[in-house]
Regions:
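Condensing-enzyme catalytic core mediating Claisen C-C bond formation in acyl metabolism
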Residues: 56-60, 87-88, 275-353, 360, ...
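Phosphate/pyrophosphate-binding loops at sites that engage ATP/ADP/AMP, CoA/4′-phosphopantetheine
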Residues: 143-156, 307-311, 344-360, 381-385
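Glycine-/small-residue-rich "gating" segment that lines the acyl/pantetheine channel
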Residues: 183-190, 228-231, 235, 239, ...
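Conserved beta-ketoacyl condensing-enzyme motif
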Residues: 59, 80-221, 250-261, 355-372
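ACP-dependent fatty acid/polyketide chain-elongation machinery
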Residues: 42-125, 305-317, 411-425, 469-473
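Active-site-proximal alpha-helical scaffold in enzymes
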Residues: 136-149, 202, 207-210, 215-251, ...
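Acyl-CoA/ACP chain-elongation machinery
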Residues: 90, 241-288, 321-335, 363-372, ...
Length: 473
């Protein structure tokens, strides 16, 4: 498939700013290279009141491995049915841990939505990588298959990139390698220890597997990782550095050290160890922390003209991406919600969409004290339009997938647009306070959804918001 149409638009954009330079509207020093010229032209264009021309980006493929099941449609169906992925942890000893529950991927033979790693990697290959990489490989395979994109030519492979992030990466593998070094000596440390745990190797493995030779990148921004990955990948396409990007997040954090560490931060639910499916309860007065989850969410992003030229199905368009920093605390969000507010505002500005145009918000909503801060920021954003918006936290069903959370929630927002339904916030028995916003308690709500906003906020005050819109020419 030729990528000429999209690249021609970038050339047209270059010609546009070049003409502005020629007629004297821009001042560019002589003796600098093409790249520096483009950068300076872009800066001058902004000063003139415009932005560099951006190509439109659409979502054409979805892939998921989650605590609700393997596959986007299975996961989505169970989410709408109010299924919880939480259960008691049985894979390792938890008696001495404060938090003894998690949202684990259902394992099995691959039927009925269970995950069977053997369907994606040979056992020998599985031993060379951490599960977070295995999950990314599986989700990426599903997304590419869903998109019907299997580049074979040099041009198509070079025009397709990968951007998959993770918040923690191979945490358990690092601990196990430490034990091996201590107990058995350095010669027994596997040569695959490093490449099997590095976060960017999720992107690397997918790139190698599918011969994708475009931008090969990764991102690590705690719980905002998945959203940042999709947002950054959309900009890579928008700026013309690729025509297709495989993007998202992946995580496999459920192990003793992670449960102990997050509990030490007072971030995990510990009051519902005997009732795990009631533990994740965003906005509820009895919430006491998040439930750790695992899995991967991957999307295929595509330049619009490229997707149309090959007849791809289009789920939604990525029209806005905002980022901000709280500069407040290593784990807590700024108490006034200013960072979240600026992040959402930035995403809407980029999208050219007013707050009153939003139909659905997939909240960060982790079932912690920060829920109230996010709610206040959203109310400030929406103003008088709050009463027309539905906002839910799907973490009530999936738990918190950390670096993969923003990616699976972007997929949920995409499917909410496709099916005109807002997924529920489970366990919302007693809202902490009143709000005009519909928090979609317990049961999914059918309603018109043309525009969705997906929020992700992470430790260190790193924030990301994505705006998705129903595709229209």
């Amino acid at each position: 498939m030729s990528c000429v149409p999209g690249r021609e638009r970038i050339k047209d954009g270059f010609a546009l700013v070049a003409r502005a330079f020629i007629v004297g509207r821009m001042s560019i020093p002589l003796g600098i290279g093409r790249h520096e010229t483009l950068v300076m032209m872009a800066r001058n264009l902004r000063k003139m009141g415009g932005d560099p021309p951006m190509r439109r980006v659409v979502i054409t493929g979805l892939g998921m491995v989650t605590p609700l099941g393997c596959g986007a449609e299975v996961t989505w169906s169970r989410l709408l049915d109010g299924v919880s992925g939480a259960s008691k942890v049985t894979a390792f000893e938890t008696e001495d841990l404060a938090a003894r529950i998690a949202c684990s991927i259902p394992l099995g033979d691959g039927s009925d939505g269970t995950f069977n790693a053997d369907q994606w990697l040979e056992p020998k290959e599985q031993r060379k990588v951490d599960p977070f990489i295995t999950y990314a490989i599986a989700a990426a395979d599903m997304a590419l298959e869903d998109a019907g994109w299997h580049p074979q030519s040099d041009d198509d492979q070079i025009a397709t990139g990968v951007l998959i992030g993770s918040g923690i990466g191979g945490l358990e593998g690092i601990v196990e390698a430490g034990y091996t070094l201590r107990d058995r000596g350095p010669r027994r440390v596997s040569p695959f220890f490093i490449p099997g745990r590095l976060i960017n190797l999720a992107s690397g493995q997918v790139s190698i597997r599918h011969k994708l030779r475009g931008p090969n990148h990764s991102v690590v921004t705690a719980c905002s990782t998945g959203a940042h990955a999709i947002g950054d990948a959309s900009r890579i396409i928008g700026f013309g550095d690729a025509d297709v990007m495989v993007a998202g997040g992946t995580e496999s954090p459920i192990c003793r050290i992670a449960l102990a560490g997050f509990a030490a931060c007072k971030a995990l639910s510990t009051n519902f160890n005997d009732e795990p499916q009631r533990a994740s309860r965003p906005y509820d007065v009895d919430r006491d922390g998040f439930v750790m989850g695992e899995g991967s969410g991957i999307v295929v992003l595509e330049e619009l003209e490229h997707a149309k030229a090959r007849g791809a199905k289009i789920y939604a368009e990525v029209v806005g991406y905002g980022m901000s920093g709280d500069a407040f605390h290593i784990t807590a969000p700024s108490e006034d919600g200013e960072g979240a507010f600026r992040c959402m505002t930035s995403a809407l500005k980029r999208a050219g969409i007013a707050p009153s145009d939003i139909d659905y918000i997939n909240a960060h909503g982790t079932s912690t004290m920060a829920d109230t801060i996010e709610l206040g920021a959203v109310e400030r954003l929406l103003g008088d339009a709050a009463g027309k918006v539905s906002m839910s936290s799907t973490k009530s069903a999936t738990g918190h997938l950390l670096g993969a959370a923003g990616a699976i929630e972007a997929i949920f927002s995409t499917l909410a647009i496709r099916d005109n339904v807002a997924p529920p916030t489970l366990n919302l028995d007693n809202p902490e306070r009143e709000t005009a916003i519909d928090l979609v308690p317990k049961v999914a709500r059918k309603r018109n959804i043309d525009v969705a906003l997906s929020n992700s906020f992470g430790f260190g005050g790193t924030n990301a918001s994505l705006v998705l819109r129903r595709y229209a020419d």
